[in-house]
Amino acid sequence: MSGALDVLQMKEEDVLKFLAAGTHLGGTNLDFQMEQYIYKRKSDGIYIINLKRTWEKLLLAARAIVAIENPADVSVISSRNTGQRAVLKFAAATGATPIAGRFTPGTFTNQIQAAFREPRLLVVTDPRADHQPLTEASYVNLPTIALCNTDSPLRYVDIAIPCNNKGAHSVGLMWWMLAREVLRMRGTISREHPWEVMPDLYFYRDPEEIEKEEQAAAEKAVTKEEFQGEWTAPAPEFTATQPEVADWSEGVQVPSVPIQQFPTEDWSAQPATEDWSAAPTAQATEWVGATTDWS
């Protein structure tokens, strides 16, 4: 499909992206029309998709999209959550018309309703989930392109791109690859330089996970501010005020306290001694008399 041109050959970095996103991993069931895109079967029953065939059908789908003169005549649809963000990003990059979410029955066939449109090409994410637009496309002779897994029915599908259309990373990467090839074939971007848009922008993210991440980031920021506030708070300034003394020789005036005068005794005088041989006093004899009678 690449026409033996080195420019259109699959690069090693593209193969690494496919393997990292799990694009080559199919399901455990196999549709008979998808057998031509299968490389091998693993021991656990999972079929492995041939990435060479995936790349060839991707280039064919990009050529079909580029062949439409008005980009708005290309309708890209995804009713599953994993492909809605990728569809909107693809439409913003290539100018296609996105239908993300529920497809209103009769959009391609009922001319009375306000949502009626007549596209020239239809690209869907999952033939099983997007069966209603595929069926209506068959009524109005509308060519269709679909991302098909190993168990996807190929009824009403004109160009099937074999890949893993269940994983969020695989679906986002396939839409990113398709948008990049469309822009390269239009000449909008060069093949010599990598596309500045990252595949992460096409990945589906659960709103609950995003809310949890934002809450965790906010709590982390608050904790960081509190931690920094405890250690980086400015220390209180202590300014010791020194009394102003004009003449340091004068010093500080100390209040005078009157000195109490105590009488002085003559230590050289002979102290008065008592006569120890004198008779005891009457009080002492009373105690002696009271204590000697033990009988």
From Swiss-Prot:
List modified residues, type Phosphoserine.
Answer: 43
Q: Where is this site: Cleavage?
A: 115-116, 133-134
Residues that bear N6-acetyllysine: 52, 89
Q: Which spans of this chain does UniProt mark as [DE]-W-[ST] repeats?
A: 230-232, 247-249, 266-268, 275-277, 293-295
Region (Interaction with PPP1R16B) residue spans: 54-113
Record's keyword terms, sorted:
Acetylation, Cell membrane, Cytoplasm, Disease variant, Host cell receptor for virus entry, Host-virus interaction, Isopeptide bond, Membrane, Nucleus, Phosphoprotein, Receptor, Repeat, Ribonucleoprotein, Ribosomal protein, Ubl conjugation
- Provide the positions where the record notes the PTM Phosphothreonine: 97
| Cross-link Glycyl lysine isopeptide (Lys-Gly) (interchain with G-Cter in SUMO2) per UniProt, renumbered positions | 89
Q: Which intervals of the chain are annotated as region Laminin-binding?
A: 161-180, 205-229, 242-295
Mutation: residue 186 to C; reported impact is:
In ICAS; reduced protein levels
Modification after translation is described as: Acylated. Acylation may be a prerequisite for conversion of the monomeric 37 kDa laminin receptor precursor (37LRP) to the mature dimeric 67 kDa laminin receptor (67LR), and may provide a mechanism for membrane association.
What GO terms are given for molecular function?
DNA binding; laminin binding; laminin receptor activity; ribosome binding; RNA binding; structural constituent of ribosome; virus receptor activity
User: N-acetylserine is carried by which residues?
Assistant: 2
Q: Where is the signal peptide?
A: none
UniProt keyword Chaperone present: no
Cellular component annotations (GO), alphabetically ordered: cytoplasm; cytosol; cytosolic ribosome; cytosolic small ribosomal subunit; extracellular exosome; membrane; nucleoplasm; nucleus
Q: Which cysteines are joined by disulfide bonds?
A: none
Chief location category: membrane
Query: Biological process GO annotation list?
Result: antiviral innate immune response; cytoplasmic translation; ribosomal small subunit assembly; translation
Record function comment = Required for the assembly and/or stability of the 40S ribosomal subunit. Required for the processing of the 20S rRNA-precursor to mature 18S rRNA in a late step of the maturation of 40S ribosomal subunits. Also functions as a cell surface receptor for laminin. Plays a role in cell adhesion to the basement membrane and in the consequent activation of signaling transduction pathways. May play a role in cell fate determination and tissue morphogenesis. Acts as a PPP1R16B-dependent substrate of PPP1CA. (Microbial infection) Acts as a receptor for the Adeno-associated viruses 2,3,8 and 9.
Family listed: Belongs to the universal ribosomal protein uS2 family.
Any miscellaneous information on file? This protein appears to have acquired a second function as a laminin receptor specifically in the vertebrate lineage.
Report the protein name in the record: Small ribosomal subunit protein uS2
